[in-house]
C-alpha cells in the first residue's frame, strides 16, 4: 500500500502504533514514516535489515514488540473473530513470555491477547464496487486478517473491476470488511536481497 504510506508521510500525524510483519527498508514501506518519527510503537515479527529502526530502538525513540510470526497472525485473527485471548506454547520460557500470564496444559503456554486496529491499510490486486477483494500471491497472508481486525479498512487496489468479475469462490475478503477503496499507481516490484546462482 505504497500510495497510502506516501499519503501518511505527508500528513501532520504522530505517535502511531503500527501492526505490520516488518517496517520495510530501502526507502519503501513503513520506513517512510519511521524516519519522520511518526511511529511510537510497532508490533512486528521481523526487524532485520532496517538500520533506521535499529537506531530508533537503541535510542529508545520507539517501542517495538517482537511477536513470533505464527502468534502475530493469530493475534490479528483473534481480534477479527472476537476471541479475547488464547494460550500458545510459542515463546513460553523465553523473553517473549515476560509479563504474560502462563499456564500449563500439555506443556507450558503463555496468554496472548488480540491485536485490534483503528485502521487497516492494505493492498489488493482487484476490488469490485462492493469492496470484495482478490489478492495476488503473498499479499493474501496478513491482509484478510487485518481487514477483519480493524474498525476501518482502507484498500489500495491495482485494478477496479465490475461487480461479478471476481467469482464468489475467489473473493479473499468480503466487502463487509472494507470501508474505503482507491486505485493506486506507480507500482514497483523491488527485490530486497538479490541472490543468483553461483553466489
Description of each model-found segment:
Residues 1-199:
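Conserved alpha/beta enzyme-core scaffold
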Amino acid at each position: 500500500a505504497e500510495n497510502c504510506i506516501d499519503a501518511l508521510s505527508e500528513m501532520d500525524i504522530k505517535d502511531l502504533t503500527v501492526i505490520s510483519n516488518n517496517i520495510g527498508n530501502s526507502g519503501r514501506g513503513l520506513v517512510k514514516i519511521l524516519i519522520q518519527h511518526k511511529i511510537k510503537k510497532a508490533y512486528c515479527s521481523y526487524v532485520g535489515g532496517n538500520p533506521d529502526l535499529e537506531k530508533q530502538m537503541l535510542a529508545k525513540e520507539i517501542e517495538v514488540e517482537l511477536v513470533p510470526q505464527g502468534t502475530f497472525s493469530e493475534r490479528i485473527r483473534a481480534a477479527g473473530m472476537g476471541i479475547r485471548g488464547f494460550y500458545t506454547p510459542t515463546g513460553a520460557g523465553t523473553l517473549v513470555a515476560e509479563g504474560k500470564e502462563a499456564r500449563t496444559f500439555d506443556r507450558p503456554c503463555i496468554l496472548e491477547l488480540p491485536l485490534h486496529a483503528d485502521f487497516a491499510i492494505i493492498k489488493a490486486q482487484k476490488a469490485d464496487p462492493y469492496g470484495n477483494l482478490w489478492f495476488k500471491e503473498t499479499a493474501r497472508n496478513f491482509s484478510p486478517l487485518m481487514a477483519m481486525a480493524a474498525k476501518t479498512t482502507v484498500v489500495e487496489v491495482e485494478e477496479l473491476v465490475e461487480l461479478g468479475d471476481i467469482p464468489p469462490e475467489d473473493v479473499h475478503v468480503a466487502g463487509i470488511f472494507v470501508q474505503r477503496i482507491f486505485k493506486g499507481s506507480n507500482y514497483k516490484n523491488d527485490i530486497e536481497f538479490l541472490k543468483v546462482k553461483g553466489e
